[in-house]
C-alpha cells in the first residue's frame, strides 16, 4: 500500500458531470495513486483493432447512453485494480460503478481479496440540472483525448493546454444523449448505491457544485492526505 495512505482502493461516485474524474486526476498527480477511469479503458478497447468484437459491440451502445454489461466492467476494473495493488499503489476508481448490482459485485470482490475495510467511497454530489449544464459545455481534445471539465473560462478555450490539439464537444455529450445518460445514471440511480455503501463501508460526501480547487481541498481532507 502507498506510504501515508490508510486506503488501498478509493471509489469515486457521482453522476455524469460531477467532476469525479477530475478529482481522481488531481490525486493521481501523486505517483503513489493510480487513476483507473473505466470510461477511458472502454474507449481504449473501442479503438483497439485486436479487442474482442463482442466487447466492442457493447461499447457501441455505451456511446448511445446505455450502461456497459457488468461482466465487462468487472473484467476491466478488477484487472486494473490488481495491477495497481501489485505495484504498491492506491487504486482510484472513477466511473466504474453505475448500478446497485455492480456495487455489490465490487464489494464481493473486495471481500474475497480481504481488503473490504481498506476501501473508501467518495461521493461527488451535484444535481441532475447541473449535470446537464456541465456536460453540454465540456470539451475533449481531438489529439490526446484530455477531457476539459466545464467552467465558463474552459468553455471559451479552443486549444488543449496539454498538447496543443483542438478542443471539441464530445460525441456522447450532445443533448439527446446526455439526457438519456441522466435518465439511466442520474441521482435516482446513484442514491441506492450511496446508501448501500453507507451500510457496508466508509462513505464521504462532498458538494461537487463548487469550484474544482475547493472540492479538491475537501477530498484531500476527508481522505487525510
Residue ranges and their predicted role:
Residues 2-5, 166-225:
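NTP-dependent small-molecule kinase module
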